[in-house]
């Protein structure tokens, strides 16, 4: 044992740790590293047990506090027969893991070189089969899952063909995710890339690339059964102080970034800088929008109220979706700048759903650069389409400001629903159908004059 303590790290290829399967070998190395205070395990490319460049995971690898796992040019895949995550913190699914005093900490998963964590072949565990016919909950089907943990670092890896969400956090804080690539051929439902669920705060998410089968990144704070049962006693349930920057990716019809909160859970102090839609112009499976804020769906007992989604700062966005930004339900005290759409039939900012109440929201620097071509048959539209603001679904707008907006062609510059008060400045559109369509109680002031 003394000789083991002298090693700078352990590997699952060390003879002392080789088990009956790859997950057992890795777990033995991690457990011993933790017990002896070595606290570092390296998973190399070649698997000594099988002499193959792969690690097949049939049970969850449990990570204790103060553990660094280095993935050295390795390929890891979930076995088709497995109904479990690849990595979790060791108390993630334990009852005592719901206690604040059992918060785990200082867990690092870092990749070196070309590292892939794959969901492998689908195992039949889907949202519609979750908990049925002897199957466990779909919440066991992530690649990584962390619950009641802090100071988590995940970096320099590729997530491939996840079976549900790639990386998921619940009641976690002070975490950093960087240099993560999501690579999905959509073949099962709801293949989000990175998900922050209830009770997450103080995250940095940066340098994210790739394509997801659903939302690329989702901040979702709702009180569904799992989020309620596994709530950490006395812990802040809100989502706040999240920094997201330099995201270049694509989503299969959904969103590059979703922000959603309901059921009294608040979302605030979210900063986004650099969200770039890299879908191909000819693609028929573009993201619905670069970013979607809110929804009139998905709540358990009540929708979010005005002021519960606030202090959202969105900068440097480009999109080929039906809108660059979709807003639903509520949004307050927020700022958007340098928002571009390159789609041929898109609105720059659009409300959606049954309701959209906005208060103290500024849109500064909006650009529409589409050529107004029908993507289905490559012919020009007979009439200009799209809007700077398509707020047809809006039900309230107090102190909404739009300034410095530019477009080649638009059908209706401002499409306002009910009770919208919009102040616009410096609007420049080369070819325009009409400036304003408005509903009851709405008005537009353009450069100081009411339209």
Where are these regions (language model features)?
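Extracellular/periplasmic carbohydrate-active domains that bind, remodel
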Residues: 1-451
């Amino acid at each position: 044992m003394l000789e083991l303590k002298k090693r700078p790290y352990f590997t699952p290829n060390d003879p002392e740790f080789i088990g009956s399967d790859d997950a057992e070998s890795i777990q033995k190395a991690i457990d011993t590293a933790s017990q002896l205070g070595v606290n570092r395990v390296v998973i190399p490319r070649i698997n000594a047990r099988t002499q193959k460049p792969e690690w097949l995971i049939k049970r969850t690898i449990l990570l204790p506090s103060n553990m660094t796992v280095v993935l050295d040019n390795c390929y890891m895949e979930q076995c088709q027969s497995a109904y479990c995550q690849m990595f979790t913190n060791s108390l993630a699914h334990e009852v005592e893991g719901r206690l604040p005093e059992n918060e785990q900490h200082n867990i690092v998963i870092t990749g070196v070189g070309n590292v892939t964590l794959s969901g492998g072949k689908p195992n039949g565990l889907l949202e519609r089969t979750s908990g049925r016919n002897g199957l466990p909950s779909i919440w066991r089907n992530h690649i990584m899952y962390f619950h009641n943990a802090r100071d988590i670092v995940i970096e320099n890896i590729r997530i491939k063909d996840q079976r549900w969400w790639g990386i998921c956090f619940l009641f976690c804080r002070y975490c950093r995710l960087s240099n993560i690539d999501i690579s999905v051929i959509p073949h099962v439902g709801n293949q989000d890339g990175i998900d922050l669920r209830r009770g997450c705060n103080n995250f940095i998410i940066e340098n994210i690339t790739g394509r997801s089968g659903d939302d690329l990144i989702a901040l979702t704070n709702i009180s569904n059964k799992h989020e309620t049962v596994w709530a950490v006693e006395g812990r802040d349930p809100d989502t706040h102080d999240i920094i997201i920057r330099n995201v270049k990716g694509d989503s299969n019809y959904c969103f590059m970034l979703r922000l959603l909160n309901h059921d009294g859970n608040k979302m605030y102090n979210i900063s986004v800088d650099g969200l770039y839609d890299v879908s191909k112009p000819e693609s028929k499976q573009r993201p619905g929008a670069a970013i979607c804020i809110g929804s009139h769906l998905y709540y358990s007992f009540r929708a979010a109220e005005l002021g519960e989604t606030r202090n959202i700062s969105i900068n440097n966005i480009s999109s080929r979706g039906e809108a660059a930004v979709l807003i639903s339900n509520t949004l307050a005290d927020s700022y958007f700048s340098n928002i571009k759409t390159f789609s041929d039939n898109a609105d720059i900012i659009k409300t959606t759903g049954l309701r959209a109440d906005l208060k103290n929201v500024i849109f500064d620097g909006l650009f529409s650069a589409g050529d107004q071509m029908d993507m289905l048959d490559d012919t020009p539209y007979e009439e200009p389409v799209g809007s700077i603001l398509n707020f047809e679904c809006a039900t309230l707008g107090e102190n909404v400001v739009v300034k410095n907006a530019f477009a080649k062609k638009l059908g209706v510059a401002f499409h306002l629903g009910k009770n919208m008060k919009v102040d616009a400045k410096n609007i420049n559109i080369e070819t325009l159908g009409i400036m304003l369509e408005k509903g009851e109680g709405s008005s537009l002031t353009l450069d100081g004059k009411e339209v």
